[in-house]
């Protein structure tokens, strides 16, 4: 069972429909106990970093996510959810994040040739093969964001070219993040979610 975290800051239903489509049993929940019992967790997110982090903390889900990460279960952060996995953000004001992957969230640089937000389809360049990125080099995914993950290169598994080389996907151990929206990226997005399904089942088998 995959639990999609509901903290009033994410596109939970569209992610749930995508998981239904690939046959991955899932549930939308804000209950810490249900989330802790999941085989894997997806942290969605749209909106502003400070408000999202505040809401996670208010519900005690920041601690829940850290416990899940420490226990080795897979976590996938999507869009703002990916950014929350990092150590901090300077969106509006400095805000501490979950600190599950080293890095800091910064605004995309101003450039007359590149609009902010970065919105629309862009091509992936795979930097490191994982179950989520295999055979996806050169494929297109759908982005909507104004901020990006500035993190060490060793954690960046896919990028897209824009005003800078945007980290499209990041990974550290059992923690994954996608800056783009897999649930809005057609068949390629579904392949990425299938990769998360593979990681989840593999992790579950190894823990039994």
Curated annotation (Swiss-Prot):
One of its GO terms (molecular function) is lyase activity. IGPS catalyzes the conversion of PRFAR and glutamine to IGP, AICAR and glutamate. The HisH subunit catalyzes the hydrolysis of glutamine to glutamate and ammonia as part of the synthesis of IGP and AICAR. The resulting ammonia molecule is channeled to the active site of HisF. Keywords: Amino-acid biosynthesis, Cytoplasm, Glutamine amidotransferase, Histidine biosynthesis, Hydrolase, Lyase. Residues 1-206 form the Glutamine amidotransferase type-1 domain. The active site is at 79 (nucleophile), 181, 183. It catalyses: 5-[(5-phospho-1-deoxy-D-ribulos-1-ylimino)methylamino]-1-(5-phospho-beta-D-ribosyl)imidazole-4-carboxamide + L-glutamine = D-erythro-1-(imidazol-4-yl)glycerol 3-phosphate + 5-amino-1-(5-phospho-beta-D-ribosyl)imidazole-4-carboxamide + L-glutamate + H(+); L-glutamine + H2O = L-glutamate + NH4(+). SUPFAM superfamilies: Class I glutamine amidotransferase-like (SSF52317). GO terms for biological process: L-histidine biosynthetic process. Its main location: cytoplasm. GO terms for cellular component: cytoplasm. The keyword Membrane does not apply. The lineage of its organism: Bacteria, Bacillati, Bacillota, Bacilli, Bacillales. Its EC number is 4.3.2.10, 3.5.1.2. This is Imidazole glycerol phosphate synthase subunit HisH. Heterodimer of HisH and HisF. Pathway: Amino-acid biosynthesis; L-histidine biosynthesis; L-histidine from 5-phospho-alpha-D-ribose 1-diphosphate: step 5/9. It is found in: Cytoplasm. It comes from Listeria monocytogenes serovar 1/2a (strain ATCC BAA-679 / EGD-e).
